[in-house]
């Protein structure tokens, strides 16, 4: 399954958000350092996983194994600026999670806003965790 968004920010900014520890920690994970092509994710609900980066093409593509599924971020420069971003998941049931992730990413790169609630007691079924 896949979903798309348009970011006013350029491909380099969007790529850095998904491909760097600091970028991921601004909208996605409590902690997400990378070493040797493996990201150590810690999420707000305390789930953890060692996620292998499968492919990384600067400003174009970022693919990783993520909690038993494959996530692929495909970036393309917009015709008049910005970034066309497509997020694909190998799990067809990921619709809500993918939309939430994309909107948090857009808020972070375009507006510098973190939409997460940062409340460990509000994680299950919360779109903003």
Where are the language model's segments positioned?
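A short gly/proline-enriched turn/hairpin at secondary-structure junctions
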Residues: 25-30, 38-44
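Short, surface-exposed coil-to-beta transition loops
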Residues: 1-2, 47-51, 68-72
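Beta-strand/loop substructures that line and gate deep hydrophobic ligand-binding cavities in soluble
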Residues: 61-111, 116-120, 127-129
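Hydrophobic pocket/interface hotspot
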Residues: 14-18, 24, 39, 53, ...
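Hydrophobic ligand-binding cavity/cleft-lining segments
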Residues: 1-32
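Generic structural detector for well-ordered beta-strands
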Residues: 4-8, 40-42, 52, 74-76
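Short, charged/polar surface micro-motifs in flexible loops or helix N-caps
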Residues: 24, 45-49, 55-61
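Short, hydrophobic/aromatic-rich segments at coil-to-beta transitions
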Residues: 33-40, 55-63
């Amino acid at each position: 399954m896949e979903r798309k968004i348009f970011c006013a920010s350029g491909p380099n900014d969007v790529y850095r958000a998904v491909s760097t520890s600091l970028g991921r920690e601004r909208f996605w994970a409590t902690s997400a350092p990378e070493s040797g092509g493996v990201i150590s994710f810690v999420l707000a609900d305390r789930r953890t996983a060692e996620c292998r980066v499968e492919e990384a093409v600067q400003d174009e593509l970022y693919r990783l194994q993520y909690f038993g599924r494959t996530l692929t971020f495909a970036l393309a420069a917009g015709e008049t600026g910005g970034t066309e971003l497509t997020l694909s998941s190998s799990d067809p049931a990921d619709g809500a999670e993918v939309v939430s992730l994309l909107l948090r990413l857009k808020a972070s790169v375009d507006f510098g806003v973190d939409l997460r609630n940062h409340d460990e007691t509000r994680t299950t079924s919360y779109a903003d965790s």
